[in-house]
Design a protein with these regions (language model features):
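Charged DNA-binding/catalytic regions of mobile-element recombinases
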Residues: 1-210
């Protein structure tokens, strides 16, 4: 009887260790399976309102997708999710607020893609921190300094900022790396040069041989 109890305790201990390892692995991989969405409103020089839809990945703060419209609807928003994640690349979880823009057509498309929606609490933007932080950076580092004439000009500006954010903008949480990781360049590679980005609002620095 005593030996049976010892054997049972050993089995329980092994199972607990395995469960702990699985939980740690799942928690480590969770950010790779979460994306967040949100809208921001941009006013043109003629006071026309344009709505920008953004998709941001929790893993390495990737800026995944954007588009612009003057008339946001559930069908249009659902189409953006399909364009952002083609060919079975959909995430597991989609975090967004309770805006009525996310209507029945949106819910249906997301469910068809196998994505689980996670809704923030009412009036709780801090629960969607990654998307809110990205939108804040986009305003402070880009849109607050540029006059927007129309939808096409806004798309051009956003394209350059998304490229800058993905390839060059550093983050403390990424140990001063960019979302698309950059290799450390040694002094032997040459002198440091600056490459203007986002119309000269920002710069990327690289080493190039003379």
């Amino acid at each position: 009887m005593h030996l049976e109890i010892l054997a049972l305790r050993h089995q329980l201990a092994v199972l607990q260790r395995r469960k702990k390892r699985v939980s740690l692995v799942a928690a480590d991989r969770l950010p790779q399976r979460i994306v967040a969405t949100d809208f921001l409103v941009v006013r043109t020089v003629s006071f026309r309102l344009l709505f920008v839809f953004v998709v941001v990945g929790h893993h390495r703060r990737r800026a995944i997708h954007f588009n612009v419209t003057a008339h946001p609807m559930a069908e249009w928003t659902a189409r953006q999710i399909a364009e952002a994640f083609p060919l079975g690349s959909a995430p597991r979880y989609l975090l967004h607020d309770r805006d009525c823009i996310y209507g029945a057509a949106f819910h249906q498309r997301v469910a068809e893609m196998g994505i689980l929606e996670v809704l923030t609490a009412p009036r709780s933007p801090w629960q969607n921190a990654y998307a809110e932080r990205f939108i804040g950076s986009l305003r402070r580092e880009c849109l607050d300094h540029i006059i927007i004439f129309n939808e096409s000009s806004l798309k051009r500006i956003l394209k350059t900022y998304f490229e800058y954010h993905q390839q060059s903008r550093t983050h403390l949480s990424l140990e001063k790396d960019a979302p698309a990781s950059r290799a450390v360049q040694l002094p032997e590679l040459g002198k440091v040069i600056e490459l203007p980005q986002v119309g000269g609002l920002h710069h990327r620095y690289e080493r190039r041989a003379a």
